[in-house]
Amino acid sequence: MPAGADVAISSPVSVDPVGATLGEGPVWVADEATLWFVDIKARRLHSFRPDDGVARSWAAPSQPGWILPVSGGGMLVGLQNGLHLFDPKTGGFELVHETEVHLPGNRLNDAMVDRHGTLWFGSMDDAEETPSGRLYRFRDGQLHDTGVAPVVITNGPSLAPDGRTLYHTCLLYTSDAADE
């Protein structure tokens, strides 16, 4: 039986019509039974609990590229200027680490956490005109530039099952399908 063959497919249902401008990065937090996601351009964080239908939204101080749970509670958010802890109870943000202060036109875009707890994330030119993005990893309070650059847009970072290869889509190279 193919993977996913036992999953029921149904028509999409709008459970929380937030009207996102650029909704991205859905992440399910099992401990809370809550779906989290960001609206990058509207500078909003959203959560939705399907069990009771509770939907919440918070304003972010700058564009959020992603949101991920932190062990022990709270969320880590990649905002335009760096990594921030977010407390859903207070709506407060606390800067953990600045990123790319020398590139004010850049923002963080997508992220994932590996099985060792290392955060992998990318940056990008918010205007999508210059390949000024980079790929980073963050662990134990230390930010490391992976040397993967230039990056236009990091999307969908994912690790191979052996944990040795990181894949991500970077929209750096294009081709014209009409070229022969």
Identify the meaning behind each predicted range:
Residues 173-178:
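Conserved small/polar residues in nucleotide/adenosyl-binding loops
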Residues 12-16, 53-58, 94-100, 143-148:
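A short beta-strand motif characteristic of beta-propeller blades
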Residues 49-52, 88-91, 138-141:
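Short loop/turn segments that connect beta-strands within beta-propeller blades
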Residues 40-41, 127-132, 171-172:
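Short, solvent-exposed loop/turn segments at conserved positions within beta-propeller repeat blades
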